């Protein structure tokens, strides 16, 4: 049985078009750290997000450059 502690996160993208709430996910501490490390290169390319309601959104680089990325950790 997997005894690795997991917690819930949610990726949120804020820009001139609104607030986009990513689908919540259960991750390990290691996965969370990997997400944070990947977010450091967020502004260098486009971004894809599956939203809470199941909608899949693709943001082009010019929109990403004017956006704020939040990784919310829920305890």
Predicted segments — roles?
Residues 1-2, 14, 64, 73:
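Intrinsic-disorder/low-complexity regions
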Residues 1-3, 39-41, 51, 61:
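A generic structural signal for short, solvent-exposed coil/turn residues
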Residues 2-36:
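N-terminal acidic leader/helix
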Residues 22-26, 35-38, 62-64, 71-74:
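Surface-exposed beta-strand edges and their flanking turn/coil or helix-capping segments
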Residues 45-75:
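Short, mixed-charge low-complexity intrinsically disordered segments
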């Amino acid at each position: 049985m997997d005894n690795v502690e997991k917690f819930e996160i949610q990726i949120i993208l804020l820009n001139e078009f609104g607030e986009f709430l990513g689908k919540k996910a259960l991750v390990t501490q290691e996965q969370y750290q990997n997400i944070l490390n990947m977010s450091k290169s967020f502004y260098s390319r486009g971004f894809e997000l599956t939203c809470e309601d199941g909608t899949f959104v693709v943001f082009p680089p010019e929109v990403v450059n004017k956006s704020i990325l939040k990784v919310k950790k829920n305890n």
